[in-house]
A protein has these predicted regions:
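Electropositive nucleic-acid engagement tracts
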Residues: 6, 10-18, 28-94, 162, ...
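Domain-level cores of phosphate- or acyl-group-handling catalytic modules
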Residues: 142-217
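Active-site-proximal, Lys/Arg-enriched surface segment
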Residues: 55-130, 135-138, 246-251
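A short, flexible helix-boundary coil/loop motif
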Residues: 1-21, 29, 127-136, 145-149, ...
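Short amphipathic alpha-helical "interface-anchor" segments enriched in bulky aromatics
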Residues: 88, 289-320
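Extended, non-catalytic structural segments that build the interaction scaffolds
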Residues: 25, 31, 275-300
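Electropositive, glycine- and tryptophan-enriched low-complexity nucleic-acid-binding patches
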Residues: 40-43, 51-54, 106-171, 259-279, ...
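Short, conserved catalytic/metal-binding motifs centered on acidic residues
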Residues: 41, 79-92, 119, 173-180, ...
């Protein structure tokens, strides 16, 4: 706990009772092997259950705390990116803050529960992710649909806007899964000064940019036909370390995002009779195909944070219903995962996926067969 105490000493606005409680909480979460809730935390420590409930309602600067912790852990010369994703958390009852219908990836359907948006910093060279800030998706507004209301995309952007000041200075790229590849979100991220690396639909509407001579009169020609992923002859080919993975890249115009993108088609020929592909992109048209592939592959580290927080830190076991206590719980679980989860398992899984080159990019669920 010496490192945690040193970080708390560097933070302003932390009272001695709050400091002592946080040190106790971190240590207790490491030794608790049952459900991590207020009752079991009090059983494994000298702190009363009501004290846990009271402190969980007090504000704590988790983003600042995690920022100081990462400054001690991340080498300055390593390549770093940020990742953002949301995860479903089961929750029963009727009066819990944020209770709504959300997509549950494990069940592949919409279910009643909570959703938590997480922003993490990913060390691309070490292939490891660090949780920075977790925010719960707010409940739907009671405003009539005829009036303009904030959407979940607006919430994700606001979460990013609040967390961006805590990023390491070298972070310039953000990676997101295909659910975030919306014009409103991509435009908002770029407005903050970051580039987006994400995934497009297999049937994305893309247009080649016209590179030929222009006519002396009339409007200048911008496009040179629709992109067909069955014909990659106009793409630049790049080999990878995996013999069955090949990258094809080109700068095109995205009709849905209304901007130029560098698109990378990752073709998997492991089954020659049925090759598969996914379509990645970056808003930075100067970024090479290998880096786009490497950055998106590193995005999967945020999934390990969610997995370990749920398995080892009681992410879905909170005995609270109000917004402040839930916010404290989700952030404490993500931090507790970093300090107490069996990091060797995460590293082994990440290394195994990195060797195959297909952990988060070419899984069977999201591959698409090339039309011959």
């Amino acid at each position: 706990m010496t490192i945690v105490a040193e970080i708390l000493d560097c933070m302003s606005g932390i009272s001695n009772p709050q400091r002592n409680f946080f040190l106790t909480l971190v240590a207790t979460m490491l030794v608790t092997r049952t459900r991590i809730n207020f009752m079991n935390l009090s059983r494994h420590s000298s702190v009363h259950e009501k004290t846990y409930r009271r402190h969980f309602r007090k504000p704590f600067a988790f983003a600042r705390f995690n920022q100081l912790a990462m400054q001690r852990s991340l080498p300055a010369h390593h390549t770093k990116i940020f990742a953002q994703d949301a995860s479903f958390s089961a929750k029963s009852g009727k009066h819990t803050y944020g209770l709504d219908q959300f997509w549950n990836g494990c069940a592949s359907k919409v279910e009643k529960g909570l959703e938590v948006s997480l922003i993490s910093i990913v060390d691309v060279d070490a292939n490891q992710g660090f949780a920075l800030s977790a925010h719960q998706t707010p409940p739907p507004s009671a405003t009539p649909k005829t009036e303009q209301t904030a959407t979940r995309i607006d919430f994700y952007l606001e979460h990013l806007h609040q967390t961006a000041p805590y990023f390491p200075p070298s972070v310039k790229y953000g990676v997101f899964d295909g659910a975030y590849a919306k014009q409103k979100f991509v435009t908002g991220v770029c407005a903050l000064g970051y580039h987006v690396v994400s995934k497009l639909r297999a049937d994305a509407n893309l247009l080649y940019l016209y590179q030929g001579a222009q006519k002396p009169r009339g409007r200048r020609r911008q496009f040179d036909g629709k992109v067909s992923l069955a014909d990659l002859t106009r793409f630049e080919k790049t080999a990878t370390d995996s013999p069955h993975l090949t990258l094809y890249s080109v700068v095109v115009w995205s009709v849905s995002l209304q901007r130029r993108l560098r698109v990378v088609v990752v073709v998997n020929t492991k089954a020659p009779a049925k090759p598969r592909y996914v379509v990645l992109f970056s808003t930075d048209t100067e970024l090479c195909a290998a880096d786009i592939f490497r950055f998106y592959k590193a995005r999967f580290q945020i999934e390990f944070i969610f997995r370990d927080a749920k398995q080892f830190a009681g992410f879905s076991e909170c005995q609270a219903r109000d917004q402040a206590a839930l916010h404290y719980h989700f952030n404490a679980c993500c931090h507790g995962r970093q300090r107490g989860a069996p990091d060797g398992a995460s590293r082994a899984a990440a290394a195994s996926g990195a060797d195959r080159g297909e952990v988060s990019v070419l899984d069977d669920e999201h591959q698409t067969t090339i039309v011959q």
